[in-house]
Structure formats: structure tokens, C-alpha cells
UniProtKB/Swiss-Prot annotation:
SUPFAM superfamilies in the cross-refs: SET domain
Family: Belongs to the class V-like SAM-binding methyltransferase superfamily. Histone-lysine methyltransferase family. Suvar3-9 subfamily.
Lineage: Eukaryota, Metazoa, Ecdysozoa, Nematoda, Chromadorea
GO terms of molecular function: double-stranded DNA binding; histone methyltransferase activity; zinc ion binding
Protein name: Probable histone-lysine N-methyltransferase set-23
UniProt: Zn(2+) 3 binding residues: C33, C64, C70, C77
Amino acid sequence: MNYEEITTTIPGPGVSQDDWNDEFQGCDCETQCSIENQCSCMTGATDNYSEDGRIVATSLLIECSTNCACCLLPYSCRNKVVQNGIKKKLKIFSTSEKGDGVLAEEPIQNREFVCEYAGECIGDQEVKRRCEVFKEEDNYTLTLKEHFGEKEVKTFIDPRLRGNIGRFLNHSCDPNCEIFVVRLGRMIPIAAIFAKREISVGEELSYDYGVSGIDGDNRKLCLCRSENCRKYLPMSVSPIE
């Protein structure tokens, strides 16, 4: 299917410019950003990334942005990884059973950034509309679920019309990648794909699409061929679950 290539997630139907432009104030760091130096963009007990750019934090990960004082430093802030884009050589290829997929053309270390799952950030009504319009085709919409106290917040990212190489990663019940919720200086997050173990040259990249909300034998068969394969691909009860 034809789609427009983009490098990072952009606002789409159902997401207002006011919401998209709801940005954080930014840090006032005068040296390298870190927990030790009390960078305000780091909200956990550890730095977001190691010195060599591998992910350390696992929740509420906020990268520094153009609103931060560290932008004026003569060296690159190490709290900027996802926004710097894809650094690894990746290739789209045709699989024998699963359509297109993505493979690594160079080694990827555990916890290294692979790519963003870039697409349009859309509202729930637009998710439902697109599912109806494209009901005979595969559903690409990724739902990010976050919990703040008792409140659940969902963010919908759809690369169907505008996206990047991340849309071609297939599901595996024993994946070598995983998705993290990352904020690039604004409240609305994006989805970043990181390696969850060492990945060899020529290995297909995959992540777990999630827990299925539907049981039964009418679901699409999983073809990951892993030892712990769950037999069927995950399916949601509704488009916005």
C-alpha cells in the first residue's frame, strides 16, 4: 500500500494543534543532563539513557527538547536519542508467509534504539472511522496505554497513510524488540522501538503486538514460529482498545 514517508509522528485528525503543542517548560541544565545534575526532564530514579545511548528508564521517559537550556551547550545532550532518528541500517524485505518485514543490516545491541513507530496521532473517532473504511485491510493503529493514578490515557498512532519503516515490523511471541512510550518535549507521547536483546545481521526485527482481547479459533494465525508461539495474532475487542 502506498503511504507518505515521515520521520516522526505528526498530529492527525482528532488531535488539536493546542493539544499537540502542549510542551514542557524544559530543563535549565548548564552541564550534561543527568539525574546526578538534577535535570528536570528526568523524573525517575535513573538517567533515561546510558552514556552510549541505551535505554535505562522504563517509564515516564521525557527527552530534552528545544525548550531546554542544554540546547545551548557545545556538546550533544545524551538525553536525546529517539528524536535523533534511526542510526542503524534497516531493510524492508518480503517474508515467505507474513508479507513485508524488517531485518537488521548491522548488529544491534541490547537496549539500543531501533526506530520510531511513526504515524499520525489521531483521535478515537478517527480510529473507528478508519477501521470501517479500511475494514478489509490490515489494521496498523498502535494504542499506547498509560495510567496516571486511576485514570487511563490512550494515544493512537496510525502509520497507514503516513508512516515510516516501523510499520513493517511483524509480531512475534518471542520478540527481539519492544515498544517504549517516549515524550519528545510535549505531553503527547510517541512510540519508540528498542532492542530487548542483541540482534544479529540478517535477523528479522519484531515486537509483541500485545495481549489478545478476543479468544476463539476465528482469529488470524500467528506465523512467528517461536517455541512459545500463542498460535493466534492478538486482536482487540474494539478499535480503540
